[in-house]
């Protein structure tokens, strides 16, 4: 299905988010969710879009009478681990109820020890790194599938098409290495290895040497594990250098942001998705989401904002199911009781020993006129 890609207005920025959940108001004091994410810099669109999706859901809940408010306190980390760690320490010292919607692997890894130490729920980070999932942590809940799930699907598709010479362009940090590990694992199961490797530094778009290295290897396809600005720069420069192969990107790249950066050069670029398409009106979650979007002046939809919307919806369901008054422990218990539950046709399932809610992954393809094919 080919559908128009829609965008969240940037005008909303990263303002505090108010919302509520479906239990009787116990007190007037809101529950505070702390979020450290990129709201400036080369990864800013990811933080902005996720936050706006969460805001969309929580605001519509807050409009209902008798609901206790939930406030998201945002702090900008610019997608830098040190800033994220400092933000997280500040949020914990301010006694936030939970940490929610962190953006990225290196930043989430910087925050995780602090969250674990103080037993603060860490819910729905925007990352699929295995290093955040293993070993199991009682207070950490992942909504999305892992990067290993994404790279397994990429390699399966590529090898099915007879494309076996695969190069990897990756960010030189924990995120990039998590993606590289996933590609290497999936290729190894096919008795294959990457034909070339090249890196880019986090928050940089200096890709000249990486393009030279990878184009020289003449791969059939390039798997990209980076943020949207660097990946877009690599695609443009590789094509200028004469490369005619296929580019595969992981979901973290940000589908809308990558397409915006590339314009007509987006044609044929592949992106794995861990959320259902927000543009497919046959999907009940997409219909609910886009109906909510239509009610907000100037708002529109994308994959990252849908993930924020669903993450807030799942967290609220955990609060609804929480035994007794809302506490950190009762939120954990409430989330663990979400067992094979449908959220508009998207299944989320947690348990006492499983805190990964979904394994859903599918492929999408960008077009040169701003659309997404799923």
Model-found features: residue ranges?
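Segments of small-molecule ligand-sensing domains
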Residues: 295-305, 316-372
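Beta-alpha junction/loop-to-helix N-cap segments that form part of ligand/metal-binding clefts
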Residues: 46-52, 60-131, 143, 200-207, ...
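Extracellular/periplasmic periplasmic-binding protein-like sensory domains
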Residues: 235-308, 370-373
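Extracellular/periplasmic Venus flytrap/periplasmic-binding protein
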Residues: 86, 129-131, 138-242, 277-291
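N-terminal export signals
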Residues: 7-26
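C-terminal segment of N-terminal export signals and the immediately downstream linker at the start
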Residues: 1, 22-37
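Periplasmic-binding protein-like
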Residues: 91, 95-103, 123-125, 167-169, ...
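Extracytoplasmic "Venus flytrap"
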Residues: 34-53, 75-82, 103-106, 169-177, ...
